[in-house]
Amino acid sequence: MIAIIPAFNEEKNILKVLKDLEKLRVDAVVVDDGSKDNTSKIVEEFAKKAKINVYLIRNEKNEGKAKAIEKGTKFALSLNKYKYIIYIDGDYQHKPMDIPKLLKKLEDTNADAVFGIRKYKHIPLHRQISNFFASILTSLAVLIYSKRFYFFRDVQCGFRIIKAEFLKDMKFGDGYAVEHFIALQLAKKGAKIVEEYVSVEYHDEAVSYITTKKILEVAKQVIKFIFLE
């Protein structure tokens, strides 16, 4: 397995993510999306002594989460040696130590992808509301786009494990619609998608970049995608 980790100014958190992955013997691709802090330096220093393979892709300027995930995924696929690809953010809100639980759910159900679900009591109210509408929108979009019914309870959760074979030729969209785009295309390919609860911790260093404007932009992109593809 290999984890794709988009990171932007995560010098306070990225090392914790990598250390947990090392304990699990999970390789990592960190995509530093134009950070102005020491994120890349920390990754480089860790990689020198790590017991896992740690790859660093550095964008000179911030290109957005979708582009970061796209670059990381294409790189991981080019290595041609991983059955599963994990997606987890670099802010340590999600815990890598939940990976075994996600993998067990994936294998026990013979699924092709497992999406993390955050318990609502751990999510700020404004995020609960935006996530509810985003999940409804994406579930309806999937039905229109793939002619298959899926109900996603937490489509905005970026913590996922997906079989590498389903990520070939994947379109990642732009900005914060990336999780939605991946869900749409997995459904179109007939992938079996299951969900599993994961831990989440909102802390002072973890900054939310989601705004109402961005949520509306995600909706616009999803609608545009299903009718133009």
UniProtKB/Swiss-Prot annotation:
It comes from Methanocaldococcus jannaschii (strain ATCC 43067 / DSM 2661 / JAL-1 / JCM 10045 / NBRC 100440). CDD domains: DPM_DPG-synthase_like. This is Uncharacterized protein MJ0544. The lineage of its organism: Archaea, Methanobacteriati, Methanobacteriota, Methanomada group, Methanococci. It comes from the Archaea. GO terms for biological process: protein N-linked glycosylation. InterPro entries: Glyco_trans_2-like, Glycosyltransferase_2, Nucleotide-diphossugar_trans.
